[in-house]
Amino acid sequence: MFKGVLFDLDGVITDTAEFHYRAWKKLGDEIGIPLDRSFNEQLKGVSREDSLTLLLAHGKKEEQFSKTEFLELAKRKNDYYLEMIQSITPKDVFPGILELLKDLRANNIKIALASASKNGPFLLAKMGLESYFDAIADPAKVANGKPAPDIFLLAAKEIGLTPRDCIGIEDAKAGIAAI
């Protein structure tokens, strides 16, 4: 019997993928790297910095930006994304998720967020779900992003369980590989 559930966020609890796509596309347009939906699939479930690395490689511009400029680009993308997600509300929670969280709570199952999104706490708060989570694994504290299992291992640790005692819920290829 499992004792914990480790949730991804985007594509599992709500869908902010379109906001990510639009923010990456806007940044890509600004730096001369066209971004289409097909390429965007590679960015799902991947950290912001790793996504930017993929985008720059896609545009053959990985050597054109200093570390400082790279970090500024990552921040700019996130600023676009944050502006777009201000409109998220509890109505944006996928059907069945709230009921699942309530059932898990009622059965004393620990719940953690294992998302590459550094905006996870903000999004959970906007949707009114933060009180259901025992822990939110901070992606800044892991050495490797998905598809490495680091974020799921940290989430399990933060709820005091071994990975074998947990179920991971994911939608992206990188996240499924991480589980």
Regions found by a protein language model. Name each.
Residues 1-41:
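Active-site neighborhood of HAD-like aspartate-dependent phosphohydrolases
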Residues 83-113:
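Short, acidic loop-to-helix structural element flanking the phosphoryl-transfer center
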Residues 33-35, 61, 129, 160-161:
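Helix N-cap/coil-helix junction residues
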Residues 27-59, 67:
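Alpha-helical substrate-recognition element adjacent to the catalytic core
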Residues 34, 58-95:
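Metal-dependent phosphoesterase signature
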